[in-house]
């Protein structure tokens, strides 16, 4: 009896529900809703059934015109039916003849607007490689797999998710060309959606280094007759009164012959040959030569004979920091840079710095943790005045100067071209949003200096900028500058497997949604990341990597995770020297493809490589 009663009650409820439906205004459900509520009894012999379903689908929908319900009957899955139905409706005009419909459903040709296309072409009509649909670089896409889940936005394949009248397209890897159509075969016809129109040689993005003979050793032995800068300015003669006055206190190599007004590299600038130009006193410019690329280990090796691990194991923290900049132009702070008031100056360690030292001996922040207060006193927040928002991270290198990434200030594909009046910097902060009274300092900017050879068009090469503060900032327990590395420090620490530290207020994970509140941290985040071998960095991306960059992060098989993410850009990648206990800024958070993805790494501007440029700008404009 109990069993019978148990069956009767649901029956009564069902009858009551049916009566309610009959008397309601909306009686019928949409086909997709109705079919999703129907429970079907599973049948045996799945292999046989697959053949039957395929035959049913072909009979119902290829040989004849079918409905959504008939397709569902054949596929027995709402998800599979939705995928099929999207292609089927896209092939509406191709239903006769049969072979044309079959080709359309296969997806290797375009029918109508080409929304059916599911092929693997990833080159545009002019020959530009497509940007990954999941990537934000070089373009921020408004269309992605979240906004258009049924559009099959895989990898960087051409698609038509917005039913463009010109057919399948993609975002491009050229920052100057946001999106472009692809040349797709038209179903059943001997033609394509748009004709191929290859760009003229020399236009667009360089996907590989120039093939011409390269200049070794950063042009220090260069004896050519080039006498014009990359910006087309003529060089001043080295014997001119202006050039002589500027050269008087410079540490020039006497072996480099300064002939006429030819570009030379007398100070061993890692950026290569340069010359003085007319204009403001101290104006200079770099000259355009194709330099031989050197691996990071070779370029920073500086002729050291020691094995890096042995060098670190065998030395103690007694080496004093040697000042590099002129305090008249640089300002104060270099003499005790990298020594944090709440840690090194009190002989205390923070919670995770031991991990860095152990990595030396043993050989955007995602998966990071909250930083301790005073842990990164050189951290700067680059803040937009209107609308008020966090733009990027940055680093305090003296009481007058701040270092950041150039793309935080200038990146036309994202409509970025900020001036000093658009921005301010907040120094000494821990909280992301709260104003920290008596702790943080807010400073206005006097001038922004972007590297003259910053390459936003191709690969963010030389992604570096200096910002001069209107007034010197006072140091405190929470505000203190970081050191910039010399050659020996770079040689010792920039080794694959050695860990550095990234800090920032960027997103905690990658997101496409407008509601980013849940992925933004409340306080400064910190993560320790290992430097990655240069060949692995190069193999992880299609973007051309230069020796002004290095990459860091965990490999898929290492069992750990971590990365910088959106909002961390411009912030520091620092390492602590076991020789003198000072913290050095080795890199600037530059770019990455997504956040914390397997097989992808964060790329950082190589600060040591660009230190001579930093010095030249500060010497010229510091007083």
UniProtKB/Swiss-Prot annotation:
CDD domains the record matches: KR (cd00108), Tryp_SPc (cd00190)
Boundaries of every Gla domain copy: 44-90
Every Kringle domain range: 108-187, 213-292
Propeptide regions on this chain: 25-43
PTM statement from Swiss-Prot or TrEMBL: The gamma-carboxyglutamyl residues, which bind calcium ions, result from the carboxylation of glutamyl residues by a microsomal enzyme, the vitamin K-dependent carboxylase. The modified residues are necessary for the calcium-dependent interaction with a negatively charged phospholipid surface, which is essential for the conversion of prothrombin to thrombin.
4-carboxyglutamate PTM sites in chain numbering: 50-51, 58, 60, 63-64, 69-70, 73, 76
Its job: Thrombin, which cleaves bonds after Arg and Lys, converts fibrinogen to fibrin and activates factors V, VII, VIII, XIII, and, in complex with thrombomodulin, protein C. Functions in blood homeostasis, inflammation and wound healing. Activates coagulation factor XI (F11); activation is promoted by the contact with negatively charged surfaces. Triggers the production of pro-inflammatory cytokines, such as MCP-1/CCL2 and IL8/CXCL8, in endothelial cells.
Similarity-based family: Belongs to the peptidase S1 family.
Protein name listed in UniProt: Prothrombin
Primary gene name: F2
């Amino acid at each position: 009896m109990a069993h019978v009663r148990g069956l009767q009650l649901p029956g009564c409820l069902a009858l009551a529900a049916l009566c309610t439906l009959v008397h309601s205004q909306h009686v019928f459900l949409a086909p997709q809703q109705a079919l999703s509520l129907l429970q079907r009894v599973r049948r045996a012999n799945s292999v046989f059934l697959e053949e039957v379903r395929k035959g049913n689908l072909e009979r119902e929908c290829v040989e004849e015109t079918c409905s959504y319900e008939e397709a569902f009957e054949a596929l027995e899955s709402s998800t599979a039916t939705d995928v099929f139905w999207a292609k089927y409706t896209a092939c509406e005009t191709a239903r006769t003849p049969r072979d044309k419909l079959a080709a359309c459903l296969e997806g290797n040709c375009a029918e109508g607007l080409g929304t059916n296309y599911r092929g693997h072409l990833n080159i545009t009509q002019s020959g530009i490689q497509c940007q990954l649909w999941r990537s934000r670089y070089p373009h921020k896409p408004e269309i992605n797999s979240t906004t258009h889940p049924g559009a099959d936005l895989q990898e960087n394949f051409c698609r038509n998710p917005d039913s463009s009248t010109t057919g399948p397209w993609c975002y491009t890897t050229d920052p100057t060309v946001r999106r472009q159509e692809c040349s797709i075969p038209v179903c059943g016809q001997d033609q394509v959606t748009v004709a191929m129109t290859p760009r003229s040689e020399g236009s667009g993005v360089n996907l590989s280094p120039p093939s011409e003979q390269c200049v070794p050793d950063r042009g220090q032995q260069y004896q050519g007759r080039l006498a014009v800068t990359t910006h087309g300015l003529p060089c001043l003669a080295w014997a001119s009164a202006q050039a002589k006055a500027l050269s008087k206190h410079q540490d020039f190599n006497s072996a480099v012959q300064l002939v006429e007004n030819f570009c030379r590299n007398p100070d061993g600038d890692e950026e290569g040959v340069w010359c003085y130009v007319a204009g403001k006193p101290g104006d200079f410019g770099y000259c355009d030569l194709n330099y031989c690329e050197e691996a990071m280990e070779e370029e920073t090796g500086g002729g050291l004979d020691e094995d890096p691990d042995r060098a670190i194991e065998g030395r103690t923290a007694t080496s004093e920091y040697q000042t590099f900049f002129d305090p008249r132009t640089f300002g104060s702070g270099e003499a005790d840079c990298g020594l944090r008031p709440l840690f090194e100056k009190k002989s205390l360690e923070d919670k995770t710095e031991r991990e860095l030292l152990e990595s030396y001996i043993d050989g955007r922040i995602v998966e990071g943790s909250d930083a301790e207060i005073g842990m990164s006193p050189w951290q700067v927040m680059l803040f937009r005045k209107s609308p008020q928002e966090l733009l990027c991270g940055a680093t305090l290198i003296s009481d007058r100067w701040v270092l950041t990434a150039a793309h935080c200030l200038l990146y036309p594909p994202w409509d970025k071209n900020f001036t000093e009046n658009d921005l301010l910097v907040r120094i000494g902060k821990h909280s992301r949003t709260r104003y920290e009274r008596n702790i943080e300092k807010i400073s206005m900017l006097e001038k922004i200096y972007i590297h003259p050879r910053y390459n936003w068009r191709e690969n963010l090469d030389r992604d570096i900028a200096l910002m001069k503060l209107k007034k010197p900032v006072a140091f405190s327990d929470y505000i203190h500058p970081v050191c910039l590395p010399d050659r020996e420090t770079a040689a010792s620490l920039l080794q694959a497997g050695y860990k550095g530290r990234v800090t920032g207020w960027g997103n905690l994970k990658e997101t496409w949604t407008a509601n980013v509140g849940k992925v933004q941290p409340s306080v400064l985040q910190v993560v320790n990341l290992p430097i990655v071998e240069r060949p692995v960095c190069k193999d992880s991306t299609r973007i051309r990597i230069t020796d002004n960059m290095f990459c860091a992060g965990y490999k898929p098989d290492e069992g750990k995770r971590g990365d910088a993410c959106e909002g961390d850009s411009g912030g520091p990648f620092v390492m602590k020297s076991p020789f003198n206990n000072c913290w050095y800024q080795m890199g600037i958070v530059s770019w990455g493809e997504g956040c914390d993805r397997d097989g992808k790494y964060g790329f950082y501007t190589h600060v040591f490589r660009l230190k001579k440029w930093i010095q030249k700008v500060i010497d010229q404009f510091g007083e």
